[in-house]
Amino acid sequence: SLQGLGTGTVVLGIHIAAPGLAIQPGDALDETSRARLSTVYMPGYKITMLPQDVVDAYTLSEGRAVPAVSLYVTLDEATLEVKASETKLERVPIAANLRHDQLDALVTEAWLSGADVSNENTAQRLPIQREQLSFLYRLALHLKAQRERVRGKPETFNRPDYNFKLVDHDGSVPTGDEQVAITTRQRGAPLDLIVAEAMILANSTWGEWLKSLSVPAIYRSQASLLPGIKVRMGAKALPHAGIGVPSYAWSTSPLRRYVDLVNQWQIIAAARHGKTAALAAPFKPKDAQLFAIISAFDAAYSAYNAHQGSMERFWTLHYLRQQGITELTASLIK
């Protein structure tokens, strides 16, 4: 959400679904999500971390008011300097969901700058004004440039994301005989960048906030960009060289990653109790449970990603067979 555009001071709202307001550590839903640790994705199907009716109840779907953990960031409209941030637990009315697959062709750099008016009739039906999206895109570019200065080199999006879709599939477990369509989506498109930078801003801001309150959280860190230096998960707020932020706590996907749900519980405690949050948070400093969760999540997440990769390879080979492709032209780089 965006408030104050044109006044010189803008308030950006980043609103995250809040299952952590209802699910409590140790209850039945916590046990279910802790057993699965993450939603598992594969072409045409997914196994959700939480029961589907719980996901449906808390997801930020348009046309209703839903519980949210909201981060409000106050910015200077001209310089984009962050002046303040505040976290609120609230019910947020969702006016509209903007979807990449429907809008990437319309929301381009040229359209945001006003240079492209070819889709003006379609744009008039958008539930958000071009001026708002233009500001969000300018902010996203600014945040990305700031991170790249810390990284020491720019991020590149040379490889597209591949989307796999099973044609006319009803969402049931695939048999392997379905017709598959494979499309590409170039990373770094305006909507993609706006969402990505907002999530990074939330994860890094909340990570630093929890650190300042001595509230434990699960962080991702990377010591440097040197070859062989991997991203690690731990309970210490350390810099993430790959992203270019002083600390990074996954907190923006609590419906599909258990680490984010754990961090959301800690954020909720911080929002409710402020400076005494460390005493009220579910997980205390050096909590053995926190380290057990990190270990279990690391193993499960790696296995799930490997499974997703295997399934995508299967459907890629299936696609080649369906299309009758027997020969490909390639470039070999030694």
Residue ranges and their predicted role:
Residues 1-334:
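Electropositive polyanion-binding surfaces
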